Amino acid sequence: SLKAQIFGCWSIPLGLPYNENLLVRIKLSLKPDGTVINSEILDHARMNKPGQGFYKVLAESALRAIRLCQPLRVPSTGYERWKDLQLNFDAREMLKG
């Protein structure tokens, strides 16, 4: 899956407080060849709020993973279904394995 490919490139930053709600939602737009046209953090305003430094670090690491994984291996059919995606990067889910 596309999510599994990107998560395989994601290095979760060390030292984050994983008891917090550290869910980063990212909207992706893809070309038919799997290249990312645009990646946008949906809770972008949260990155600049006081006390949200951990969230910002995690969000930046998720965007980095998307860049590193390009081009994604995408299905040869159904472009209309997967050209725009929303991915949820949840550090707690990743740490559970």
Question: Locations of the language-model features?
Answer:
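Conserved "boundary/linchpin" sites in short secondary-structure elements
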Residues: 4-11, 27-48, 63-97
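Short secondary-structure boundary micro-motifs
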Residues: 10-13, 55-56
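Short loop/turn motifs at secondary-structure junctions and domain boundaries
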Residues: 16-21
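A short, polar/charged loop-to-alpha-helix boundary motif
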Residues: 47-57
